[in-house]
């Protein structure tokens, strides 16, 4: 009910008098409480004054929020007690519960209470304030709770919302209590409208506590402490959020309390720790320390105890017994062990013959002391490959400031017995004497035995022991000597035999506790000549020599010979099952490629293999626009056979036959007259693709791990991202040159000896390329400078688009080789070189690599094959086609998008690998490869090679994944290459003067499918393999490929020059990179590279550098 609010003072005073009079006159009817006005709910006006009266048969009192506000208590004459509570100047904060209860318990029900709820609508107070405890509601199970957002006006409409939501929740509301229901672990607020103003309550947090069975663990920093040191114990509870710790300890029983500290382990959820720290421990603090943990919700409890020992001072005590005499066997490792207890941790020293031992004896002595428990230690002295000189008196001493103990023993070195001499002599007395001399430690015993039937002895007939017996007519004489320096015994025994009438096998056996040794000698009668023994020995040596020569000849014949991997297909049989390859020696060689030797200045060795080497050189007069040009020169070693010289000449003819292409290491010239054959090619200073990916992996990972990278970061930016350090191209070995590796450690790494020269070749210490410098720090020398238009990408950061670009460029180069009917047969990332501006070139690096020591090449018969990169038909049927190169291209893609990983890392190179390939096993998607890239890999790895996509289709598939900026830049570089006076372009134009303009796309219908013609020359080039037309997968309309432009020559020749080594300058046309979710995989092992001028290719190819 609503009562009038403010009343005049006189009226209030009169009312109080009247009320008191009524109370005095009213008879005592019951002992119950009477509240005036009766309630149970009142609505009062703000700023008004109101009186509440409570009466009863015992003293009564008004309570408000568990407190007794100021009130007037009285007792009437009839024994009735009353309490008057006057509320003045009411505000909204006076809203709430008021209780009237008895003030004592004189036989009355102590729990009898009268409740009255008063509302004071106050526009300035929307919601009643709550204590901090009321804002956090904790639950241990799913149950109904109340969110106490109470208002001062019962007429207000109140709604409940999640803290970050606008939708009202359908929960019943009580103006006196709040919202009641089952709530989730969320944050909630209440809203109401007062006038035209929306009012929000404080946020209420509902939180469900983790309550489970208590699991307590107690540990101490040290269970043994000295008097005066600190005792620190930790009690940890797992699986609960609110628990109570109670410690019991010896000091507590004597009334000396220690306040423990409780904290939460933030890095381990639901882990609470209580720490008991007792400073300056006394002897009385020894005893049991117990941690009792209780949880009040489910009344769970658990306790653990630990014993603490306080000692007056430290101690060292030996455990167990160690004999005073120890043994060690010569040349065997021996570990001497001493176990002891100590506190505090002691210092341990070992002595030999009163000299301190250490770990500095070249690895022959190892000392170690380890702590096996808190106070238990094991000290070990390990003698590695024991020597006689290590015998002696040893002492172990353990000590600290409070105590000391030592243990001594004698070490005896046991030496296995060995027969040093067994000889026979014929004294003049007619008897025959056999003398046996041997040594060992401990003292050896000597046993003589003999066997008369040489054919059946000793396997069928046991030897007869000899001694002082009349039957054998033999006598023994034995002398024993101890050698102090060697610390071993020497035994000399002489056996005297009488009347030896036929050959006799005499055996001398020495035996001691370590082992035994035996030698035999044939004692022959005096009449038998000793020349028989000498002749037998000579014949045996002759036989061994002949067998050794045969083995060496067989090994020499099986030694792999250098052969070029690239093959050019001439024709295919009508049934498509036989291929005839072009005999490279029948190809013409144009003298246009010839370069005078005096225009070539050779420098340091870049790479060296089993058959040849590649050196850095400076060529003069190759280009009109450049007086000098840095080049790579391939040559054979002086030990090369004629077949290998023929193979190198065949490689030269194939390269000149193929012609130039932007993504192939191009032939620049050759020296074939007046000395060894030199093949001069382009010089790629950043080395092979595998090494490049390894050295720049950190820039890729940093670049893509930053999720906050601004979208304005672009593909062709010349600046590093903010906060990204300059790339640190780490060299993996001591020396490196130009990105090429010296594959033979015993070869010279300085300068190439000019063999068979006429004196017309110049030598120079060519300045090594600074391959370790980042892109933006590299300043090329004059011969290397080129225009900025020839750079595809200048960014020093390795990006995802770079990986796609590398794949695209390799596909372009392989498309060119396929158009020339050329099969690569060793396509891998190690045979792809990186030039300036992230331009890649396909090569064959076998000449400068020792394939017999390269783990990527597996011996199969008399050759070494890169099995992990080979297609199934190549492995099992020796079938090589351009479509088997497509399989290898898929493996190369996997290498690129694993940042230089080794294929099939989970498969050993044994029968398991072959079985997995036969079953159709394929590698999983690399972490950095998109689904589109992995789909291309899977197409390349089709079991049936007929349905693998040709390289022309792979170019189009990869082109779709590139940005327009990249494609335009690549086309610009390609066109610039064709218009330049690059030596490969000029010499090809001179060789084909009538060939101008762009070549039309390859018409595969007229290539490779002619009838087989008889070939009397080289049957070695015929490999039976089917190579029908590939079935092109059904793809959508594809854009034209720009790669064909690189396979043609343009008659327009400008003054610009293309070089693989070029300075880097900013570019204007950026391309945004795709967003990647980067997953870092374990980094594969990197091979070591020699330090040189530029990154070295990995030693992983079989054949030619080109």
Curated annotation (Swiss-Prot):
Residue span, Protein kinase domain? 600-962
Mutagenesis / variant outcome for changing residue 716 to F? No effect neither on interaction with GRB10 and RASA1 nor on phosphatidylinositol 3-kinase activity
Disulfide feature: 54-100, 149-190, 235-291, 436-508
Instruction: Write the signal peptide boundaries.
Output: 1-32
Annotated site (Breakpoint for translocation to form TRIP11-PDGFRB)? 527-528
Variant or mutagenesis effect after changing residue 666 to S: In PENTT; likely pathogenic; gain-of-function variant resulting in constitutive autophosphorylation and increased phosphorylation of downstream signaling proteins; levels of protein phosphorylation are similar at 32 and 37 degrees Celsius
Q: Where is this site: Breakpoint for translocation to form the CEP85L-PDGFRB fusion protein?
A: 558-559
InterPro entries found in the cross-reference section: Ig-like_dom, Ig-like_dom_sf, Ig-like_fold, Ig_sub, Ig_sub2, Immunoglobulin_dom, Kinase-like_dom_sf, PGFRB
The entry's stated outcome for residue 857 to F is: Reduces kinase activity. No effect on interaction with GRB10. Abolishes interaction with RASA1. No effect on phosphatidylinositol 3-kinase activity
**Reported effect, residue 778 to F:** Strongly reduces expression levels
List all membrane-crossing ranges.
Answer: 533-553
Q: Which PANTHER family match?
A: PLATELET-DERIVED GROWTH FACTOR RECEPTOR BETA, TYROSINE-PROTEIN KINASE RECEPTOR
Quaternary structure annotation from Swiss-Prot or TrEMBL: Interacts with homodimeric PDGFB and PDGFD, and with heterodimers formed by PDGFA and PDGFB. May also interact with homodimeric PDGFC. Monomer in the absence of bound ligand. Interaction with homodimeric PDGFB, heterodimers formed by PDGFA and PDGFB or homodimeric PDGFD, leads to receptor dimerization, where both PDGFRA homodimers and heterodimers with PDGFRB are observed. Interacts with SH2B2/APS. Interacts directly (tyrosine phosphorylated) with SHB. Interacts (tyrosine phosphorylated) with PIK3R1 and RASA1. Interacts (tyrosine phosphorylated) with CBL.
Q: What is this protein called?
A: Platelet-derived growth factor receptor beta
> Which classification does the entry list for the species?
Eukaryota, Metazoa, Chordata, Craniata, Vertebrata
Query: What is the primary gene name for this protein?
Result: PDGFRB
């Amino acid at each position: 009910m609503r009562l009038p609010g403010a009343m005049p003072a006189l009226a209030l005073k009169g009312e109080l008098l009247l009320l008191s009079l009524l109370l005095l006159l009213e008879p005592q009817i019951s002992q119950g409480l009477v509240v005036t006005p009766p309630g149970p709910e009142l609505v009062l006006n703000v700023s008004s004054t109101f009186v509440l009266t409570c009466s009863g048969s015992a003293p009564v009192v008004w309570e408000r929020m568990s407190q007794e506000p100021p009130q007037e208590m009285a007792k009437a004459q009839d024994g009735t007690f009353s309490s008057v509570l006057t509320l003045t100047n009411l505000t909204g904060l006076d809203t709430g519960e008021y209780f009237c209860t008895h003030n004592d318990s004189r036989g009355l029900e102590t729990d009898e209470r009268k409740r009255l709820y008063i509302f004071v609508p106050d526009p300035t107070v929307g919601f009643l304030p709550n204590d901090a405890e009321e804002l956090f509601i904790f639950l241990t199970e799913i149950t109904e709770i109340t969110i106490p957002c109470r208002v001062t006006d019962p007429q207000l409409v109140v709604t409940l919302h999640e803290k970050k939501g606008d939708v009202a929740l359908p929960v019943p509301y009580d103006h006196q209590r709040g919202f009641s229901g089952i709530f989730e672990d969320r944050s909630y607020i209440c809203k109401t409208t007062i006038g035209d103003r929306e009012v929000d309550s404080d946020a209420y947090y509902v939180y469900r506590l983790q309550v489970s069975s208590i699991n307590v663990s107690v540990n101490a920093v040290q269970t043994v402490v000295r008097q005066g040191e600190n005792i620190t114990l930790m009690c940890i509870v797992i699986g609960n959020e609110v628990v109570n710790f109670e410690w019991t300890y010896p000091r507590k029983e004597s009334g000396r309390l220690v306040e423990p500290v409780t904290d939460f382990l933030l890095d381990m959820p639901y882990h609470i720790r209580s720490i008991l720290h007792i400073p300056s421990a006394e002897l009385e603090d020894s005893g049991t320390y117990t941690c009792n943990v209780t949880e009040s919700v489910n009344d769970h409890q658990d306790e653990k105890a630990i014993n603490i020992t306080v000692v007056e001072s430290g101690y060292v005590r030996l455990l167990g017994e160690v004999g005073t005499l120890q043994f060690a066997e010569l040349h065997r490792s021996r570990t001497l062990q001493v176990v002891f207890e100590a506190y505090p941790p002691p210092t341990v020293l070992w002595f030999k013959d009163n000299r301190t031992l250490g770990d500095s004896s070249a690895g022959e002595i190892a000392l170690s002391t380890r702590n096996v428990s808190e106070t238990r230690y094991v000290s070990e002295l390990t003698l590695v490959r024991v020597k006689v000189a290590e015998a002696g008196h040893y002492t172990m001493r353990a000590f600290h400031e409070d105590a000391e103990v030592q243990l001594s023993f004698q070490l005896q070195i046991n030496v296995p017995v060995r027969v040093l001499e067994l000889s026979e002599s014929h004294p003049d007395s007619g008897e025959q004497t056999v003398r046996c001399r041997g040594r060992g430690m401990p003292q050896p015993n000597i046993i003589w035995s003999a066997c008369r039937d040489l054919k059946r002895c000793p396997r069928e007939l046991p030897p007869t022991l000899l001694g002082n017996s009349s039957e054998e007519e033999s006598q023994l004489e034995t002398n024993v000597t101890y050698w102090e320096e060697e610390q071993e015994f020497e035994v000399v025994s002489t056996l005297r035999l009488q009347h030896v009438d036929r050959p006799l096998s005499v055996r001398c056996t020495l035996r001691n506790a370590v082992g035994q040794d035996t030698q035999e000698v044939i004692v022959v009668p005096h009449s038998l000549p000793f020349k028989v023994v000498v002749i037998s020995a000579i014949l045996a040596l002759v036989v061994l020599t002949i067998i050794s020569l045969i083995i060496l000849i067989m090994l020499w014949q099986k030694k792999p010979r250098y052969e070029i991997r690239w093959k050019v297909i001439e024709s295919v049989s009508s049934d498509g099952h036989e291929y005839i390859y072009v005999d490279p020696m029948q190809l013409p060689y144009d003298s246009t490629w010839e370069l005078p030797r005096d225009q070539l200045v050779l420098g340091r060795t870049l790479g060296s293999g089993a058959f040849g080497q590649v050196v850095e050189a400076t060529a003069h007069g190759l280009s009109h626009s450049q007086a000098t040009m840095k080049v790579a020169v391939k040559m054979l070693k002086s030990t090369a056979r004629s077949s290998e010289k023929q193979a190198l000449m065949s490689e030269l003819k194939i390269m000149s036959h193929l012609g130039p292409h932007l993504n192939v290491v191009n032939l620049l010239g050759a020296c074939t007259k007046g000395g060894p054959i030199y093949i001069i090619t382009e010089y790629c200073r950043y080395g092979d693709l595998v090494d490049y990916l390894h050295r720049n992996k950190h820039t890729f990972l940093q670049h893509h791990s930053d999720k906050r990278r601004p979208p304005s970061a672009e593909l062709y930016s010349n600046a590093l991202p903010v906060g990204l350090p300059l790339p640190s191209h780490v060299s993996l070995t001591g020396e490196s040159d130009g990105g090429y590796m010296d594959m033979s450690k015993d070869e010279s790494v300085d300068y190439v000896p000019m063999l068979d020269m006429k004196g017309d070749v110049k030598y120079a210490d060519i300045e090594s390329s600074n391959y370790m410098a980042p892109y933006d720090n590299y300043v090329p020398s004059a011969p290397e400078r080129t225009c900025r238009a020839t750079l595809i990408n200048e960014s020093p950061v390795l990006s995802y688009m770079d990986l796609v670009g590398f794949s695209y460029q390799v596909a372009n180069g392989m498309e060119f080789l396929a158009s020339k009917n050329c099969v690569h047969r060793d396509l891998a990332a190690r045979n792809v070189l990186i030039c300036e501006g992230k331009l890649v070139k396909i090569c064959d690096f076998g000449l400068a690599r020792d394939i017999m020591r390269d783990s990527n090449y597996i011996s199969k018969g008399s050759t070494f094959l890169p099995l992990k990169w080979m297609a199934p038909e190549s492995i099992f049927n020796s079938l090589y086609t351009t479509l088997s190169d497509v399989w290898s291209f898929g493996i190369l893609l996997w290498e690129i998008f694993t940042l230089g990983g080794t294929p099939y890392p989970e498969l050993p190179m044994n029968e398991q690998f072959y079985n997995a390939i036969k079953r159709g096993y394929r590698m999983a998607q690399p972490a950095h490869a998109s689904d589109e890239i992995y789909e291309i890999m899977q197409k390349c790895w089709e079991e049936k090679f007929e349905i693998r996509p040709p390289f022309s289709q792979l170019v189009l598939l990869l082109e779709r994944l590139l940005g327009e900026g990249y494609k335009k830049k690549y086309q610009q570089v390609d066109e610039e290459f064709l218009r330049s006076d690059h030596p490969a372009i000029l010499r090809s134009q001179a060789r084909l003067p009538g060939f101008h303009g762009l070549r039309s796309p390859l018409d595969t219908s007229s290539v490779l499918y002619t009838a087989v013609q008889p070939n009397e020359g080289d049957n070695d080039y015929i490999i039976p393999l089917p190579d029908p037309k590939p079935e092109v997968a059904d793809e959508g309309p594809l854009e034209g490929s720009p790669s064909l432009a690189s396979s043609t020559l343009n008659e327009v020749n400008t003054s610009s020059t293309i070089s693989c080594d070029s300075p880097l300058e900013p570019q204007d046309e950026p391309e945004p990179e795709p967003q990647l979710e980067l997953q870092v995989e374990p980094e594969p092992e990197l091979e070591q590279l020699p330090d040189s001028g530029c990154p070295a290719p990995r030693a992983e190819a079989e054949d030619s550098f080109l």
